[in-house]
Regions:
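Transmembrane alpha-helical segments in integral membrane proteins
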Residues: 66-78, 142-158, 236, 272-303
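Helix-loop-helix hairpins and the membrane-proximal interhelical loops
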Residues: 3, 7-11, 15-57, 193-301
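Cytoplasmic-side transmembrane-helix entry/capping segments in multi-pass membrane proteins
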Residues: 84-92, 166-170, 306-310
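Hydrophobic faces of alpha-helical transmembrane segments in multi-pass integral membrane proteins
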Residues: 17, 21-24, 63, 67-71, ...
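Early transmembrane hairpin of solute transport permeases
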Residues: 2-162
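Long, well-ordered mid-to-C-terminal structural blocks that present hydrophobic/aromatic surfaces
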Residues: 297, 309-312
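Membrane-interface helix-loop-helix junctions at boundaries between adjacent transmembrane segments
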Residues: 113-119, 124-136, 147-211
Length: 312
């Protein structure tokens, strides 16, 4: 079981590997279009401004398409057979899931406490996935769809069918079964997600008000789970989903960077949610504590030699 959970966490990390270059380019382009940093080069309409604005728009690709990335990436690490075909099946199944939810909200949104928007803009609880107005399930929805498709794929991809049904073997059979499976998943999602929103809002306000103590607990849990390969399950919803702030901490930070750079107010007032990204400090200030732990638990006769190693 632990090995399966580790594989799941590793599969989730695949899209995260793309965040570094995307975040770097978002940051660089934001700085390049900030007049306080580059001066008159960043004036609207100049070739410099036009170039970096286009670069910045393209740099948002990963952050603006997170659900699709997670839907496609999960089979890479989890599928036992033909993972490339499983990625295609998962992508199509996720689109079907979004269309199912879109129609459910359109027909029964009033009963669910959701309002179907008249235009292609996000509303409360509603998001737009490649032109599909659907329920906002964050990255949990695509992960659930993708995991379902992976299970169906590994079970039925090599299933034997009569010769006259040969067209429906392989990926066709997997998608046929997945089609009805994600329909059931969409119905369940439509029923429970509005209640999940209430819990998420409560948790979001709680996390926003925990201060340094809460961030310390988060860092401790992340480091405790890291040896088991399970830390992705902890930080993914906080960094990349809507648990702490809409659109996730990293995407919001990148979009607000020009505003933050102009402000003279303390960062903990402007963006208190950004404290959850300060996990790197534990590596710096945790070293003296680690050294003290080594020294205090060493045998008395060996402490002098250990001190020579630890202090430098």
């Amino acid at each position: 079981m632990l090995q399966k959970i580790q594989r799941f966490g590793g599969a989730m990390f695949a899209p995260a590997m793309l965040f570094s270059i995307s975040g770097l380019m978002v940051g660089v382009s934001a700085l390049a279009t900030t007049a306080d940093i580059v001066g008159d080069l960043a004036v609207y309409g100049t070739p410099w401004y036009v170039f970096w604005t286009i670069i910045q728009r393209g740099s948002w690709t990963v952050f603006k398409r997170l659900p699709l990335l997670f839907a496609v990436a999960l089979p890479i690490g989890l599928a036992q057979k033909q993972p490339a075909r499983c990625c295609l099946e998962a992508l199509v199944a996720y689109f079907a899931y979004c269309f199912f939810l879109s129609e459910i909200i359109k027909l029964s949104g009033d009963n669910l406490g959701l309002e179907y928007p008249s235009s292609l803009t996000s509303a409360s609880g509603i998001t737009v996935i490649d032109g599909i107005k659907t329920l906002d399930t964050g990255i949990i929805g695509p992960l659930a769809v993708s995991a379902t498709v992976v299970a169906i794929h590994d079970r039925f991809y090599d299933a034997k069918v009569p010769d006259w049904l040969g067209t429906f073997s392989g990926s066709s059979l997997v998608y046929l079964i997945s089609f009805f499976a994600v329909f059931a998943l969409a119905a369940i999602s439509a029923a429970i997600v509005p209640y999940v929103y209430d819990v998420t809002d409560t948790l979001r306000h709680a996390l926003a008000g925990v201060g340094p103590f809460g961030v310390g607990i988060f860092v401790f849990l992340e480091r405790a789970l890291e040896p088991f390969g399970l830390h992705h399950l902890l930080y993914m919803p906080i960094y990349y989903d809507n648990l702490v702030i809409n659109d996730g901490i990293y995407a919001t930070w990148s979009s607000l960077l020009p505003i933050l750079s102009h402000s003279t107010r303390p960062l903990n007032e402007l963006a208190p949610w950004a404290g959850f990204t300060a996990t790197g400090w534990v590596k710096l200030f945790g070293l003296p504590a680690i050294a003290a732990a080594f020294y205090s638990t060493a045998k008395p006769e060996r402490r002098a030699g250990l001190r020579v190693i630890l202090v430098p």
